[in-house]
Amino acid sequence: MPRRRRVLKRRPLEPDYQFSDLVISKFINMLMWNGKKTTATHIVYGAFEDLKTKGEDPLKVFRKAIDSVKPEIEVRSRRVGGANYQVPMDVRPERKLSLSCKWLIDAARARVGRSMQEKLSAELYEAAQGRGGAMRKREEVHKMAEANRAFAHFRW
């Protein structure tokens, strides 16, 4: 009887059917609630259509929004000598992508009124311009890291 739990292998992520892009597929999966992937897909593609009606290339706006929201540094709690310190650390590339997607989705959900499709397209557009709720969240995280720079020597 083995003592270790068996670790299940991760299923590979399928690219989305319209753009064949893994990042969009991950974004759709993160937007999805209660397993309703079709609804999440309609929301994302509808937001892309809204961006297209504004005269923008939706794929470029999406990529620019994701890249501009990605955090470079974040704080993590580290216990040293009975005290917890917020230690600034670099963010791994996979986590950068996850955090930027999460922040964009949360900022879109926090917007008031209208449909989720319109809120998401507005948030993507603003993030690509360097504005919006997701960019505020990124700046907040960077400010926290800057404020706790004195504890950077606790990195491991």
Annotate each PLM feature.
Residues 2-34, 38, 45-156:
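Strongly charged
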